[in-house]
Amino acid sequence: MKKVLLLVSLVTALSSCGGGGGGGGSSQTGSTTPVPNNPNQPGNSNAQNPTQPGNNQPGNSSAQNPSQPGNNQPGNSNAQNPSQPGSNNPSQNQITGKGVSVAVLDSDFISPDVHTNQLYHKESYLGEILDREFKDRFIQETKSSDPNRNNLSKNNHGIIVATILGGNSGTGATGAKIHGVSVSQGSGFYLDVNKYQELQNKGVRIYSHSFGSQKSFRENPNYREEFRIYLRTLTESILTTENDRRVDVLTNFYKNAVNEGSLFIWAAGNRRFDGTNMNGVSVQAGLPYYIPSLYKGWIAVMGVRPDGREYSPYFARADWTSLQEGVNSAKWWTVAASGDCEIDGCTEYGSSFATPKVSAAAAKIKEKFPWMTGHEIQQTILTTATDLGDPGVDNKFGWGLLNERKALKGPAEFSNELLVGESAARNGAKGQFNANIGDNITSKFENDITGLGGLRKSGNGTLILAGKNTYQGSTDIESGTLEIQKENGSPITIKSGGTLITTPTTIIGLKNSHYDNFSPVNVKNEGGTLENRGSGAVITGNYTATAGSVTKAEIGSKLIVNGSVNLNGGNTTLQTLSNGRYITAKSLSSTIIEAKNGINGNFDKMKTPELIKGSVEKTDNQINVKLSRKNILEYAKETKADEMQQNTAQNIESAFQKLDEEIENGKAGNLSSFEKKAATLQALDLTNRAAILDSLSGQIYASAQALTFQHSQTVNKDLSNRLVMLGTLDNVGDNFGLWVSSFGANGKLEQNGYGKGDTKVFGGQVGIDKQFGDNLILGTALSYSKADVKFNRYGGKSDASNFGVSLYGRLGNKDIPWYLQGRFGVGFVDSDVERDIILSSNDYSRAKINHNDKVYSGYVETGYDIKNSNGDFVVTPFAGITHDTVARGSFSEDKSQFGLKADKKNYSQTSALAGVRVGKAVQWNGGSKTTFQGYVTHQRAFNDEDLSFKAEYSGLPGSSFKVKGIGLSKSKTKAGVGALTEVNSSFGWYVNYDGEISSGKGKGNNNVVTTGLRFNF
């Protein structure tokens, strides 16, 4: 609340002091505008600065200040009515000028003791205002490099102007970066070219000036003389030759800056020193009258009431002194805007406060259309203004009242007077609006565009014309894309780097409003691309395609040409595009071009989407295509796809055959969603083919089962190592033994032609066992682990939680050479699977499902210990049989039409193994014993389990096919080392490493590290 009161106090103080003749209120009309007050003079709060010429002229007192509420002017109560044309409506338009730099050249932004500061005795007040209104968006520019400029005005006019333009309390460009440039010197102003150039080098391209001479641009033909007071310091007296030189330096900067895309926005002015009306904009605002090349980067802003009516007495008009049509009239670069301050508590008005509204609009346009230079921004602001006064561009209001909302929809006219200048336009020159749109940028012009000028589309970006356009100049698409959505009355030429897109509502023709018909307009394709989307587009004239041109047509679309189609020269291409329509294996014939006056020539070649084959046929006035889909498996083989991709292609082909059958039998009504996605899939291209086929493989549901088998064998090996350990213990416990272990494993699942999976397993077991008699030990164990696998090639990932129960036993002890040991276990697996399903570069989804599995495991091993005479070294040949059964639960990927749905499936593998183990016991002085062990074993399965399963796509019931993945390896070689230390009769610890290498179909490896403790009781 304190800061709000401070701001109100600021604007109240400013209002009582006068805002500036070129801008805020008539209290400054007796001087160069805006004229700051001298706060050091007692009682000067309501008087003009007496040092200014003409200040003693009658009528130049506060009595002329029209800033009081109401001001006896009807309609002024609507000064802040957001419904007025051009007002900013944040709920409808969130464009704020973000990222755009605007320079505000005005009175004083840097003096620490500005007027309000003195009134409130708060040295930090200026900083508080700037911080609250702009935060880090305000840059206080340094003073001029001229050492003689050290007498700043200490006036708040510039802060108010900047706040209207971009402050948080205003409705302007609240996201723009504001460069506050203090150009005041005492009660005047100093234009420093070096400061201009510094701003230009910082990237500033929009310059806002709320000051200027109080003579209209036509009053003194020697405009250089009017610049004298702006190009010298207070103490200087310069000769005419020096003044002319300085003017040349300044105007040369303006010329160069305009050519670099800058836009200079000037207050038109209020009234003369003597209080009389200005019938033309100020000399500065009217500079293009003297230097015509500046026309494309200049705007003069006239201050009017919010509803467009003039104040009484009126402020500077556009060019009222030249009622006849004169060359370089300022009306061509003049626009009107509300001159009300429009900040709470501020009742000042004038062209000073109209100017920042136009500057704010320019910043917002620059944000929305970042490719626009000052010339395009100027045209957009001027041509979208709401007409005032006489119809069209007039000498009073210029183009009319600023309409920011409309301006943010793009230009409304391609005017030759703005494109090439008034003089050139009078001599018949025509210009083109240059839409030079950069890469990855799409802009839309929503206004109906009129005018005699044309359009040049350059740059690789896209421009969409969404209005009903009647501009008559030529349209040249040199590069990038132009999309026409409605009517367009301009002849179009598509150059080699350009693309024209037409839609079902496109009409290339000039609308005759009196007769409600269209005059013929031609389209010429000179090596570029015409792309017709949907049926209904009309070219009212002729369509000509020359050598190297491409004509694209969506499947099922038709382009109507009221004239003739001329396919001239060689190497013309017809290319069909997917439009969401599925093509069956049965041939489909459709007309893509129909010409009322016939077709001359034919296309030399035809291109279709990757999965579509077609041919072209020409009749007298039609071009028809016949299309059918390719066999997906044959296509995959032709492109040398690997095994996984060919399997995917076979599955898609099976589904498409089912879909074809349903369509031909008229039973596809419930399959429309799947049919649409199938059409999307048919549009794949070389850039995304591999990704699509990989993602649709579903291999993870097959391949991930290999991890379940691998995990079961990891648990099995941990228990096997414990059983071997029991055969070496001197003491297994009088009552029972308790052990706990933890293990970690990482490995790979891989097979030629499939995605590779990286596996990780972390878990542990806890067990208890008891010796029965001298030779038998029985026990039970619980295990819990987390296992995950991530596949490349869009295979997805699986995270599984495993809980298991095992029973184990060993017959034989360290004193008996022969032993028999085994284990039986049941595991419960909770698996979460995620994978991407890609149908096109823009159509992809992520499937997330859960399935619950069970694992049944059994292992039996027998061996014989061969010991040395000391009994501390042993060699043990052994053999065994292992069996695992995985019962995978059912799952359904319902969120995608091409998601997989499968019933539960059982997988089993039984293997035999043989190996040899060696051990060496070492007795330590403290009584402890460590047994070092190592082993190698080879395992071979009796069956070849490939882990494939039957599935169907969730969007196409009955489309059964086989999903394949990495199979189980038939042969594995394992090796390991470990150490068991019996610290005493009650406690021991152990560590093991086990490595596994698979060979054959399912190649891979696994590395397991196990540690554990044992307690005897």
In which residue ranges do the predicted regions lie?
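Extracellular repeat-rich scaffold modules on cell surfaces
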Residues: A337, D344, S351, K357, ...
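Subtilisin-like serine protease catalytic core
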Residues: N88-L191, N201-G203, S216-R218, L294-G297, ...
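Outer membrane beta-barrel translocator domains of Type V secretion systems
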Residues: K667-I866, G967, D994-F1015
